[in-house]
Amino acid sequence: MRLDKFLKVSRLIKRRTLAKEVCEQGRITVNGNVAKAGTVVKEGDELVIRFGQKLVTVEITNVKETVRKEEASTLYEVKKEEPISKSE
């Protein structure tokens, strides 16, 4: 599944267009590599997403085309959440 679609389906980012913009800005890495919106992701991949003043590391646990809102968080597991220091 494309990265931008996964981010939207999992509700890590609300809209696919916003997910695409975040990817274009280089704020997401997949397994340590800066990712584009079209990067294919699979179970076991590690995403690091820069949200404003924090870095969130998640592992993809499941990939589905559609899920209900209540089940969206079952697609990933948050591994780490840390603030970004001012020097970065």
Curated annotation (Swiss-Prot):
Q: Which Gene3D superfamilies match?
A: RNA-binding S4 domain (3.10.290.10)
Protein biosynthesis as a keyword of this entry, yes or no, is yes
Annotated membrane-spanning segments are none
Q: Which GO terms describe its molecular function?
A: rRNA binding; tRNA binding
What SUPFAM superfamilies does UniProt report for this protein, alphabetically? Alpha-L RNA-binding motif
Signal peptide range:
none
User: By its UniProt entry, which CDD domains does this protein fall under?
Assistant: S4 (cd00165)
GO biological process: one example: translation
The S4 RNA-binding domain extends over 1-67
Alphabetically ordered keywords of this record: Protein biosynthesis, RNA-binding, rRNA-binding, tRNA-binding
What is annotated about its quaternary structure and interactions? Associates with stalled 50S ribosomal subunits. Binds to RqcH, 23S rRNA and the P-site tRNA. Does not require RqcH for association with 50S subunits.
Q: What does this protein do?
A: Key component of the ribosome quality control system (RQC), a ribosome-associated complex that mediates the extraction of incompletely synthesized nascent chains from stalled ribosomes and their subsequent degradation. RqcH recruits Ala-charged tRNA, and with RqcP directs the elongation of stalled nascent chains on 50S ribosomal subunits, leading to non-templated C-terminal alanine extensions (Ala tail). The Ala tail promotes nascent chain degradation. RqcP is associated with the translocation-like movement of the peptidyl-tRNA from the A-site into the P-site.
Family membership: Belongs to the RqcP family.
Q: What is this protein called?
A: RQC P-site tRNA stabilizing factor
Q: Which organism is it from?
A: Halalkalibacterium halodurans (strain ATCC BAA-125 / DSM 18197 / FERM 7344 / JCM 9153 / C-125)
Q: What is the lineage of its organism?
A: Bacteria, Bacillati, Bacillota, Bacilli, Bacillales
